[in-house]
């Protein structure tokens, strides 16, 4: 791997044989968010790519992603220092994959979604978040032990506390209250 610069951004490039598929991940530190604001980052990750932008409807955007990309997704992660588990950093992640010849589409669509998403359709946002709530309930029913283990981890690991707020039972409770 190698570290490089592209404008104001630092890049880490891995040269791995991927059979003509390019993968790009962009990490945004969430250091500026207070703890009680962290669940809103998950809400943002849930709705980005599923709402209209200034140039395309959500349906058109979905068609473009299906036609030109393998994936365009958003998530939140917690990164832990391998040496010091007290040092954690929540990150907002945008990931995309595309065939090598479609990389310009990946860059263009990712930028459009990040910069031009229209958040005015509150009913659509409510629907998306309602689907997320239902999916979480189904996951609790089918793999409740995993949710319980993550919840227990929040009692002794700093990263567990943040994960709980971003995607665990804590986030589920936040989401229920929000809806």
Residue ranges and their predicted role:
Residues 1-22:
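N- or domain-start disorder-to-order transition segments that initiate the globular core
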Residues 20-49, 56-116, 122-179:
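M16 family metallopeptidases and their MPP-like homologs
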């Amino acid at each position: 791997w190698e570290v490089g610069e592209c404008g104001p951004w630092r890049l880490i490039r891995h040269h791995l044989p991927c059979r003509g598929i390019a993968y790009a991940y962009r990490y945004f530190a969430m250091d500026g968010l207070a703890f009680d604001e962290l669940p809103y980052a998950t809400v943002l990750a849930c709705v980005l790519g599923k709402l209209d932008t200034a140039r395309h409807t959500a349906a058109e955007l979905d068609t473009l992603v299906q036609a030109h990309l393998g994936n365009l997704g958003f998530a939140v992660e917690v990164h832990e220092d391998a040496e010091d588990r007290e040092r954690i950093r929540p990150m907002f992640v945008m990931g995309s994959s595309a065939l090598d010849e479609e990389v310009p589409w990946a860059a263009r669509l990712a930028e459009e979604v990040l910069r031009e998403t229209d958040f005015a359709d509150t009913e659509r946002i409510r629907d998306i978040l309602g689907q997320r709530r239902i999916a979480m309930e189904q996951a609790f029913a089918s793999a409740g032990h995993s949710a319980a283990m993550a919840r227990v981890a929040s009692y002794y690991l700093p990263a567990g506390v943040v994960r709980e707020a971003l995607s665990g039972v804590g986030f589920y409770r936040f989401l229920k209250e929000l809806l």
